[in-house]
Each structure stands twice: as C-alpha cells, then as structure tokens.
Amino acid sequence: MARVALLSTDNLEEFFVYDELLVEPLAQRGWQAETVSWRDESVDWSVYDLVIVRSTWDYQQHPDAFVRKLTHIDKQTRLENPLSLLLWNIDKKYLKSLAIKGVPLIPTYWGETFDYQVLLESFDTFCAPGLVIKPTVSANADDTFWLTPANCADHKILLEKTFAQRPHMIQPFVSAVTEEGEYSLFYFGGELSHVIIKTPKKHDFRVQEEHGGQLKLVDATPRMQQVGEQTLKALPTESLYARIDIVRFKDDWAVMEVELIEPSLYFNLDGTSPQRFAEAMTHYLKRT
C-alpha cells in the first residue's frame, strides 16, 4: 500500500480531532495512513508517498520553524496542500489578494506595529460598537481580542505587549457571529462536500469546539455556494482541501477566512464526508 502521513503535532489532548475517520476510506483506496508530528526531527519523509497537513494546531507558536519543515517535506515527497498555497495562506494578508479579485470580505485595518490611538479610532472608522484584533499569523483564536470602547482601557497593557512589534489586523466585530453563527463550507478537490454552522457559547465570540462552540450540519443556500465558488476561483492554485468561513454581513455573505493549512474538516458531523475526501483525493492526485 502507498503511505500517507497526516501531519499533526506532538500533543492534541486539548483539541478535538477527527482525522482517524479518514483511515478506513483511505485504506479502501490503497493508502496506509498514519499520524506524524511536524515537530518530530527523526522522521524520514521520503518513506511517504504523500503528506497531508492536518492538525498542526501549534504552528503559529513557531511559524518560521513550521515553514522550514514544510519546505523540507516538500523536497522529500508530495505535500498537500501544495507548498506554495500553504505559504500564501499562512499570513492572513492573503485576504488582500482576495479583495482585489472581488471576494466579499469584512473590512480590515492592517497594522505592522501596535498603535492604541488607531485602535480607538477604528470604532469610528468602521462605525462599529465592537472590534476584533488578532495577529496576521494565528490559529485557534490565539491572541484574539473582542473589544468595546468600554473595555479597551482594561486591555491596553496586554494589547501593547501582544502586538508591540507584531503584524495584526483590526476588523469590526460582526454581530451575526454571536446572533446567528459562522458558517464553514468544506471543499474537497474543488467540490463542495458539506457545510456546518458554528455558534459560540454565551458571552463568547470564539466558535471553536475547544472554546465551547456548538457545531451543526446545515445546507448551503445558492448565494453561500456562489460566494464559496468565487473564493475558490480566486485562490492562486488548486487545493486538495479548503474550508471557507463566511458570515452574514450587511445583507449578504462575507468571507471571514479561507483555511488551507490545517482546518478541522469535521468529518464527525457528516458520516459520508471521509469517503468523499478519499474519493476526491484519488481524482485530485491524478489530475495535478
């Protein structure tokens, strides 16, 4: 059987991981899958026919080391998503290129160094009662803050410490995240697989399971699919997998993020999605 490494990290105890649901569908198609940490320096990546980035959910702590490891793996075997796409997606400034191509997005201020006055002015700039600030290289909502005019001063010292010399982004807080939820569209080999809605727990804005978010399988509306397909077409190259996070914004849908590195694909919520992934992978590898 061909060997595929599902790239992960050393410790997943605090995370919900569903990639084991891929093992049997992949085996049915001639692939022996095993989970391997990107931090393991003893691995000979050339023994694998394919490496798929999956649950590397600590890469944001050492992004330079992560990039070096991806580059090393890419020299030894086939890496998916493609290295060029992973590097493009690792910094959220990729959203700028999507904006140029007309993808509907949440308005964003991009900062290289932290300026508290700019943060305060952003409430007026965006005509928003709340803001979200986060690093441009981040995952799992790490170092992400939901701010209001009333609590900014309380967070000032922590914000200055967190973002002093760290590229970051400021966006208006989108109330639909807490009032309705954030939707995720999952694409395997360019085809829509399934859609879920993620809602945060009470008094929170983070939709991840690890932060108490609730998840449910839903159907996509035609407009949601249109935005998803428009976003896919705006990517620099094809992807084996993609998760497009969208939210209702000003009577339409806006893209929050496009996850091409290590998105949870929530195979647990759709029992046939692991089979769809394995089948899409088979066709994708043949044509790319």
Regions found by a protein language model. Give the residues of each.
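Phosphate-binding site of ATP-dependent enzymes
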Residues: 148-232, 236, 247
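Active-site nucleotide/adenylate-binding loops and adjacent lid/helix of ATP-dependent enzymes
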Residues: 2-8, 70-76, 84-180, 222-226
